[in-house]
Amino acid sequence: MRTSVPGVVLATSLLVAAQPAAAEDGQVELVGETTLPHAMQFDGTTVGGLSGVDYDPSTGQWAVISDDRSERHPARYYTADFDGTRFELTGTRPLLRPDGTTYPAGSVDPEDIRWDPLAEGFWWTSEGDRGEQLIDPSIRGADTGGSSTHDLPLPANLRMTPTTGPKRNEALEGLTLAAGGTRVVTATEGPLLQDGESPTTEHGALSRITLQSRTGSVLAQYAYPLDPVFAASPTGGSANNGATAVLADQGDQYLVLERAFVSGVGNSIRIYRTDTRTATDVQHVESLTNADVQPARKQLVVDLADLAPSTIDNIEGMTWGPRLPDGRRSLVLISDDNFSPNQTTQILTLAVK
């Protein structure tokens, strides 16, 4: 049985032909499912748009970040308690600019959050924007009160220019801290402008996983092969697939959550284990289109549809939770309801062998 994506091939041919290895049966089990009420009010804020989640094993505290662009309330994060069945918010703090003020409406797009194991605080990403005004994505640090502590420099190819950099809504969706907190790892949701088309039903695409030091030095950057979109829209509406979360696993391995949405069909959520050890470092590769590079290998951990949850919503956040009583690791997922009454904030707990 094949255990990984084939080796060095032209990027364009990989996107059509390469297939990840199948998941091993029985390795993942759905053990918990809960939801939050739509437009729930907490401490003067409307809860929604929860696009990132993290768990601190040293304190037992959970963090979730809202992708509210300071349009309903100031950009913010929440703390929470979670026992696997009941998810209870315990606090909220605004995310602050270096001058101590809140972000103006539309100037920030929070996406992911990770507790810092080496300092009292957390890291978070903003997707930026490719609109009338170009706003670079960002990786920022904050203390537990939300005050800014640092801003990590980005490699040039992740910055916005008129012809290069992340596409709109396909920038830094995923963030994780690896190697004991010494390595800052991000994933773009989709390919950069210079890296070709986003996934379609005919082909996948190459996003980029970037490894940096805590001071911003680029340690490596790898091409990650996104799946094609799983179905065509029967209504002619939108159809997409992208990486919405990355999570440190073991050594040079990471879990990547691919979230696909097809208008008139629904969502598909697949989690892959990706291994960068044999991948080409592409930090100096200007464009991945037709580039002769070896992407990171990936193996399917679980297709959420196989676990038959009550629904599959717009899941964007992923974190390791506490060990379960039987010794298995818990993997917790959270959905971004886009503040829509037609969606739900869904929290799923998976048991992983």
Regions found by a protein language model. Give the residues of each.
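Sequence/structural signature of beta-propeller domains
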Residues: 20-353
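Secretory targeting and sorting signals
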Residues: 1-24
